[in-house]
Swiss-Prot record:
The keyword Nuclease does not apply. Its EC number is 2.7.1.95. It comes from Streptomyces fradiae. PANTHER family: 3'-PHOSPHOTRANSFERASE, PUTATIVE-RELATED (PTHR21310:SF41), AMINOGLYCOSIDE PHOSPHOTRANSFERASE-RELATED-RELATED (PTHR21310). GO terms for molecular function: ATP binding; kanamycin kinase activity. Pfam families: APH. This is Aminoglycoside 3'-phosphotransferase. Belongs to the aminoglycoside phosphotransferase family.
Amino acid sequence: MDDSTLRRKYPHHEWHAVNEGDSGAFVYQLTGGPEPQPELYAKIAPRAPENSAFDLSGEADRLEWLHRHGIPVPRVVERGADDTAAWLVTEAVPGVAAAEEWPEHQRFAVVEAMAELARALHELPVEDCPSDRRLDAAVAEARRNVAEGLVDLDDLQEERAGWTGDQLLAELDRTRPEKEDLVVCHGDLCPNNVLLDPGTCRVTGVIDVGRLGVADRHADIALAARELEIDEDPWFGPAYAERFLERYGAHRVDKEKLAFYQLLDEFF
């Protein structure tokens, strides 16, 4: 399926490309539809994508599961697949991404809201979560990604610049934790994926849930802390990462696990 088939189903919307087809997936923003139809987002990806985060059928399942449990996520408008492709259409959710340049007086409130969201996700029941991201599954996928050349070795964190896939795997094996503190994790809990009300700094939406699943809580807090600390969003920094961890619950944080899960993310 190409996007023309889906475009014919939404002929009154203007289609705006959001990305450039990372891992074969395309995301479009649909605006200008007939009132009172909301703004929409459409994702189109291979039916069997190389990157599991672009399994759109699985993402739709995760969105519907989160909605049933009271987490603010995009409403699924349409989902489907044919022989070659899958698609997912969702309503846009209101709010401003936590990654945006918030006024200085609101920034600590933004990271505290992210921490509260992490706690809310981690309190959801693991028994009926629709996906498994335990280490056995995640490490197996990491090995496949190395074997298939899917790890971007030019985009590693500074301390691992120049490493090979085999070096990454060796370090992953060496530092793998013996036990997992299992909760429901978002899987990519970065500031870009959390939307907040610009007035109250309360969470209004959670997006890009393709990696949601049962995993150690550090799979979330490690990525959130890293993204708040590094200088890609220079209005944040180490003090904001520390505030996030404090608000989440510093007594729950294992620094060795933080490092391990930041390493694990290099494979995805």
